[in-house]
Amino acid sequence: MKVTDLTVAIIGDNPVVRIVTDADLCGYGAAESFKPYLKPHILYYKPFLLGQDPRDVERVMLGIRHRGAFKPWGSAVSAIEMALWDLAGKAAGTTRPPAIGW
């Protein structure tokens, strides 16, 4: 499974991340409320994410953190991580990520 797209929609004032894969699965994550200005910060990571395996959340997040993931971008990175965990859970056929284990 590989990431084929990353999009951000501003719903109200809330950035909502959508990560799409070649397996027709989508993962969703959201940043903090009232931070629509995070959209370009989230999209900054798109070139890195394309082609990555979203089920390997820890490895992907390590790569993101090497590209800069601290303030003011922390919320942007968290939204991406939420979407990756959402995908990991869907790929495992469950509503929870497999790493949680319950």
Give the residues covered by each predicted segment.
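Structured beta-strand/loop patches that form or line metal/cofactor-binding pockets in enzymes
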Residues: M1-G29
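Metal- or metallocofactor-binding catalytic centers and their adjacent structured scaffolds
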Residues: V20-T95
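Flexible hinge/switch segments at interdomain interfaces of large molecular machines
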Residues: A99-W102
